[in-house]
Amino acid sequence: MALSVQDCARLTGQSVPAMERFSPLRNIWNRVREYARAATTAAGITWLSRYVYHYHRLMLEDLAPGTPATLRWPLYREPPPHFLVGYQYLVRTCNDYVFESRAYSRLRYTEITQPGMQVVNWSVMANCTYTINTGSYHRFVDLDDFQNTLTQIQQAVLAERVVADLALLQPLRGFGSTRMADRGELEIPVESLMQDYYKDLRRCQNEAWGMADRLRIQQAGPKDVTLLATIRRLKTAYFNFLISSITSSAASLRIPHATVLSLPCDCDWLEAFLEKFSDPVQLDSLNEAWQSLPMQQMIRCTVSALSLPQGPHLLPPLSGSGMQGGVFELRPRENGRAVTETMRRRRGEMIQRFIDRLPVRRRRRRQPVPAPVSPEGPAVEEEEFMEIEETPAAFEQEVRETVAEAIRLLQEELTFAARNSQFFNFAVDFYEAMDRLEALGDINEMTLRRWVMYFFVCEHIATTLNYLFQRLRNYAVFARHVELNIAQVVMRARNTVGDVVYSRVWNENGLNAFSQLMRRISNDLAATVERAGHGELQDEEIDQFMSEIAYQDNSGDVQEILRQAAVNDADIDSVELSFRFRVRGPVVFSQRRHIQDLNRRVVAYASQLRAQHQPLPELHADVPLPPLQANPHPPLPPDARPQRTM
């Protein structure tokens, strides 16, 4: 694919005038003779990159003509003969994040030669790492009377997590940068400081909950914030509706008639639904509700709400007689038609009107499906059909499907960056794991400690993979020219003295590697929670466990996985997360004759020094460049292919 000057400038960090001076060319077919032989082959460019131009460092400089980086060897006031398109952008992406160490290795060059095309590509492996402190979660897990207060601790942990997942309606905005007293005039990125703060579970405690969603919303634009907040309100309202449906069957009888909504009293019941139920989930009220409900039922309500718009997941059985949901009371018929059937027929129009009222400009306006015209007097067949009594579950299911459809349409209005939510669905896996543990009666100190720790780890992995996805795959200019070949996440758990307790590796190939990694890691860690406290796996259990975590070949040592399942998580003080990925991008050649001639002289001089077994000059060394010798073909660099004569 041809590269424009503007695209080259964006992905190399150079100015447009500098790239215009460079005059990039991607395909050198039929123009090879314009260049020094070493500058056109993968082997020759490898030699130039490693020993002469040092491209791994030079590509990060300002290489406009006459800048300090170009004054001396080997550029002599001109840009280099090649640019690695996307390399500087990749390094800048990694530098802009909270990684503690970054390494770039295996910078290699490959060439593709076929009729009509001769191009060279570069590839590099990036390895970015940071450590999160996952030691004692003092607030809950390390209480001295843990066994005596297990239920209360479990409720507290889950309640705070639910509040973080459902009640984050007004995220902090406008971080930008600021100045601090001890930093002089240096601008401090506050958002990065807060991410650093979240690296320590012992320090941030319950504030760690919801970190991934907070950062996601903070990075969204004004329109996306409105839409994401509305989606969160719908999920919160549905969760509160489920809790109300379960807990208020008796209390609803005492509700004054004026506060009872008869649905569907009009076509826009969703507005009334949000008005009554979308108050943020409060920690105190949630703890009170938890006292009167079975733990498993509360977890299922949470999963059902968080999994929207997918599902239905674990729709909890609702108690009470009659179709009631807290302050909602349903009339048994409307024009002879069942209430749920009426809601279903009006669903599309009602959702469209709801979205149209939001203070955002819509991408496209859908034509609502016209509602079928029904006569005032129902037909005999309809009367016979409606004799079948409508169940409360049908109404609850219709409410969920309506909320789910509204969320789906709102997600379509999001920008692509904000719509991409596959990195933030890991919570459902963990709640479902807790639901299974609760059903088995297997909640103990070990499982709860691991659940908290792995949830915290997943928050970080999701945030980082989403950042890399947005910068490397969702940025159209980079994705158009640079390929993601492989991505890998390495998780190393260490004890208090720094020894590795276990190490896990997940690999994925292809353009969707980041999102595929998140799905695998979420499922893997959630399934491993259920093994906490059970010691080493028996031989007959290993195959089943490997199936549960969806183990794939070349994804780490099986013994490390078994060690992770059996370890006592109290021994783990920190977790090191390494994000490795290999990308491949295009090399562009200069069409400027003066740059080509300079390169030919540099190649000749470097080849002469090598032939004489003399060291090559250091980058930016003050070395006079000798004129080109009469022989136009200097000694070949290592492995350079002889030029064909026509």
UniProtKB/Swiss-Prot annotation:
Q: Which domain of life is it from?
A: Viruses
Its name, as the record gives it, is Preterminal protein
Where can this protein be found?
A: Host nucleus matrix
Coiled-coil intervals, chain numbering: none
Assembly and binders: Heterodimer with the polymerase; this heterodimer binds to bp 9 to 18 of the genome. Interacts with host POU2F1; POU2F1 binds to the auxiliary sequences in the inverted terminal repeats and tethers the pTP-POL heterodimer to the origin DNA thereby participating in the assembly of the pre-initiation complex (POL-TP-DBP-NFIA-POU2F1).
What's an example Gene Ontology biological process for this entry?
A: viral DNA strand displacement replication
For the site Cleavage, which positions are given? 175-176, 326-327
